[in-house]
């Protein structure tokens, strides 16, 4: 990135890193980022070792996105805002009275791990029935695979040669847009 911007390390005022998971209250350690298989990773220390002399900050990805919206985006001039992220996981960041809401245990809005369905689909966190297990990219992939197996005549099967490993969220979405009944049911 420095090369791309024609900058040197001495030009960097601080470094911010965001991760899809829970950060401890001190902002030092990634407690759990299941999609990355990070558990109790001292990320701030690791980055400080790689970039000595540069202040390092770590945060939850959705919280970082909400702060970016507060300082430079849609929340500029607002005291309150709610941001939802949807991709590999499901998260959220809340700005209250101009400040990041981190919750009682500093986990912010781990919306993806809110309990939704009793005995439901497995989640990356190890629980079953979390919201993320139903609406994140992994859920779309899972449902696309199920739909392809149940409908061997589907566009999903045709485009992948019936190989479940070739199902992606983009493919499911593209097939649904093209009118594939199997994909539209995902």
Predicted regions mapped to residue ranges:
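Glycine-rich phosphate-binding loop plus the immediately following alpha-helix
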Residues: 58-62, 116-154
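Short, ordered coil/turn segments that flank beta-strands lining enzyme active or ligand-binding pockets
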Residues: 25-26, 96-97, 177
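Glycine-rich phosphate-binding loop and adjoining helix at the ATP-binding site
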Residues: 3-15, 21-80
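A mobile "lid/hinge" subdomain adjacent to the ATP/sugar-phosphate binding pocket shared
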Residues: 134-186
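Short glycine-rich anion-binding loops that position phosphate/pyrophosphate groups of nucleotides
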Residues: 20-23, 87-89
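Glycine-rich phosphate-binding loop of actin/hexokinase-like ATP-binding domains
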Residues: 76-135
């Amino acid at each position: 990135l420095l090369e791309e911007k024609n900058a040197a390390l001495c030009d960097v005022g601080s470094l911010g890193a965001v991760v899809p998971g829970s950060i401890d209250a001190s902002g030092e350690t990634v407690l759990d980022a299941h999609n990355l298989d990070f558990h109790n990773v001292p990320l701030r220390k690791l980055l400080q070792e790689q970039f000595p002399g540069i202040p390092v900050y770590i945060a939850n990805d959705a919280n970082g996105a909400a702060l970016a919206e507060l300082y430079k985006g849609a929340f500029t001039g607002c005291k309150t805002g709610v941001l939802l992220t949807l991709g590999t996981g499901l998260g959220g960041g809340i700005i209250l009275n101009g400040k990041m809401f981190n919750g009682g245990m500093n986990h912010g809005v781990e919306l993806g791990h809110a309990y939704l369905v009793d005995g439901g689909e497995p989640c990356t966190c190890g629980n079953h029935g979390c919201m993320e297990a139903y609406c994140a990219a992994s859920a779309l992939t899972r449902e696309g695979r199920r739909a392809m197996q149940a409908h061997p005549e589907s566009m999903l099967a045709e485009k992948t040669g019936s190989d479940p490993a070739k199902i992606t969220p983009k493919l499911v979405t593209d097939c649904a847009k093209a009118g594939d009944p199997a994909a539209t049911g995902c």
